């Protein structure tokens, strides 16, 4: 099974982007969760508006699906300015970035998703633009080439990344506002599910929303995706309303268990428990045992299991924790 096949993957798939857009909150007061980040942003935005200045450059980082793009849109809405969106891989040449920068108006937000994937050439252009609101452009080629400086209006760069450590130090240092997004708790996710259901015109009770939230791996994008699949089940198998029982039946049918694990998560945990006596087991052996690439385990399967305390990463290899044994109704050997 590859990552794109998984219902509970946090990355965008299918029509996620179009549907997520319809459900996105527009203002900070509508945004649920990330309380510390929200409180900080309210202060920074109000201060910038009082001084009639562009907001400082902002780096939003954290696991995928937590609302980095949504937050960038909200910043633009709160500041009352336009937002232009792009992503690191799209900006292949310096001219691609220059075209975007020269079309910005004073105070506008430039949002670059996957900013850790910017090419070095494009990144070099970005430094003076961020620091001095200037664009250095080379005119001509060879010995006759010369550099000219263009003044840019004050703007706010909002960079988003799932891998803050992959940013170069010079780029990271130019962001005045670093914001880390954390996984959501069940209460906040339940609120998000309820709001999304209202947008969809779907009847859902609090227990139904909580059941979906519990299995959403702390991620709003997954919660909204599961909600859409539960709606399908409710309309076909029941009267269209989502209760706890309906949500449980639908998610069990989809093979998403009470912890938000799917077949691949359980396969990985059981391999450590059954084939390697709970570990420690090296990554290459584990990959061979479950028929997956080591990169898939490291980047896709492991992070959530480690974050939730089901796997422990040690110098000698991976170990299944007591919590992993309990999940399958087993007792961990002493």
Swiss-Prot record:
Keyword check for DNA repair: yes
Residue ranges of the TM segments: none
Keywords for the protein's UniProt record, in alphabetical order: ATP-binding, Cytoplasm, DNA damage, DNA recombination, DNA repair, DNA-binding, Hydrolase, Nucleotide-binding
Residue segments, region Small ATPAse domain (RuvB-S): 185-255
UniProt-annotated binding residues for Mg(2+): 69
SUPFAM superfamilies: P-loop containing nucleoside triphosphate hydrolases, Winged helix' DNA-binding domain
Signal peptide: none
Localization terms from the record: Cytoplasm
Region (Head domain (RuvB-H)): 258-334
Location, primary (coarse class): cytoplasm
Function: The RuvA-RuvB-RuvC complex processes Holliday junction (HJ) DNA during genetic recombination and DNA repair, while the RuvA-RuvB complex plays an important role in the rescue of blocked DNA replication forks via replication fork reversal (RFR). RuvA specifically binds to HJ cruciform DNA, conferring on it an open structure. The RuvB hexamer acts as an ATP-dependent pump, pulling dsDNA into and through the RuvAB complex. RuvB forms 2 homohexamers on either side of HJ DNA bound by 1 or 2 RuvA tetramers; 4 subunits per hexamer contact DNA at a time.
Protein name: Holliday junction branch migration complex subunit RuvB
């Amino acid at each position: 099974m590859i990552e794109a096949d998984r219902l509970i993957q946090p990355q965008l798939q299918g029509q996620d982007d179009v549907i997520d857009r319809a459900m996105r909150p527009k203002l900070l007061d509508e945004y649920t969760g990330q309380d510390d980040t929200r409180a900080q942003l309210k202060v920074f935005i109000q201060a910038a508006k009082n001084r009639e200045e562009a907001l400082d450059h902002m780096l939003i980082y954290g696991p995928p699906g937590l609302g980095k793009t949504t937050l960038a849109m909200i910043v633009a809405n709160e500041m009352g300015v336009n937002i232009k969106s792009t992503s690191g891989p799209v900006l292949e040449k310096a001219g691609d970035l220059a075209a975007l920068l020269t079309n910005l108006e004073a105070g506008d937000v430039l949002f670059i998703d996957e900013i850790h994937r910017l090419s070095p050439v494009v990144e070099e252009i970005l430094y003076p633009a961020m620091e001095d609101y200037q664009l250095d452009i080379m005119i001509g080629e060879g010995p006759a080439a010369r550099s000219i400086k263009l003044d840019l209006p004050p703007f706010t760069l909002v960079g988003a990344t799932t891998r803050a450590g992959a940013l170069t130090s010079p780029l990271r240092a130019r962001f005045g506002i670093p914001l880390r997004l954390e996984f959501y708790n069940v209460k906040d996710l339940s609120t998000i599910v309820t709001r999304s259901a209202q947008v969809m015109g779907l009847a859902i009770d609090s227990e139904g929303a909580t059941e979906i939230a519990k299995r959403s791996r702390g991620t709003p994008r997954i919660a909204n995706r599961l909600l859409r699949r539960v709606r399908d089940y409710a309309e076909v198998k029941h009267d269209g309303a989502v209760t706890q029982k309906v949500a449980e039946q639908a998610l069990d049918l989809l093979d998403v268990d009470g912890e938000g694990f799917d077949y691949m998560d359980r396969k990985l945990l059981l391999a450590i428990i059954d084939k390697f006596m709970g570990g420690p087991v090296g990554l290459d052996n584990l990959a061979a045992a479950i028929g997956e690439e080591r990169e898939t385990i490291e980047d896709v399967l492991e992070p959530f299991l480690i974050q939730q305390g089901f796997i422990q990463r040690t110098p000698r290899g991976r170990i299944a924790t007591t919590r992993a044994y309990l999940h399958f109704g087993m007792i961990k050997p002493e």
